[in-house]
Amino acid sequence: MKSKVIVDELTMKRAITRITYEIIERNKQLDNVVLVGIKTRGVYLARRIQERLEQLESLHLAVGELDTKPFRDDMRVEEDTTSMPVDITGKDIILVDDVLYTGRTIRAAIDNLVSLGRPGRVSLAVLVDRGHRELPIRADYVGKNIPTSKTEEIVVEVVEVDGQDRISIVDPG
């Protein structure tokens, strides 16, 4: 199994900053926006975007934590550990995840969201888009486009969970 670091800590920080600026530019009214991180690493990325928005715009946005496991079609998990600090009805939700691949996690996230309320709008921010979609899902905000083969894997590490920030590509061959 070969692993290669393709994004270091500084480049990852810049990608998150770029996503933050795009969110500011595309959302005229940020006070209706709720950031919703998809567990696990998407939550930490959403918090970092929240921190940058606070630094740049002096605006504190709510951050929710969305558990997609109970809504996935490829596993059976009963317990839902979703935590949403506000009612999402009518809100502009920005889902945040680390990697966009087939789109199945995002479909499950949307299913969970609509079980909680009726958002006004839902958009998607991902740190890495690696292609190979199986569902018609597209990210609105992308930190890095990293094309891969189907056998390769993208591994995003965040300091809060893994002790370091970096993105690697792993080839099991």
Swiss-Prot record:
It comes from the Bacteria. Its EC number is 2.4.2.9. GO terms for molecular function: RNA binding; uracil phosphoribosyltransferase activity. It catalyses: UMP + diphosphate = 5-phospho-alpha-D-ribose 1-diphosphate + uracil. A motif (PRPP-binding) lies at residues 93-105. Gene3D superfamilies: 3.40.50.2020. Pfam families: Pribosyltran (PF00156). Keywords: Glycosyltransferase, RNA-binding, Transcription, Transcription regulation, Transcription termination, Transferase. GO terms for biological process: DNA-templated transcription termination. Signal peptide: none annotated. Homodimer and homohexamer; in equilibrium. Belongs to the purine/pyrimidine phosphoribosyltransferase family. PyrR subfamily. Regulates transcriptional attenuation of the pyrimidine nucleotide (pyr) operon by binding in a uridine-dependent manner to specific sites on pyr mRNA. This disrupts an antiterminator hairpin in the RNA and favors formation of a downstream transcription terminator, leading to a reduced expression of downstream genes. Also displays a weak uracil phosphoribosyltransferase activity which is not physiologically significant. This is Bifunctional protein PyrR. The lineage of its organism: Bacteria, Bacillati, Bacillota, Bacilli, Lactobacillales. The gene is pyrR.
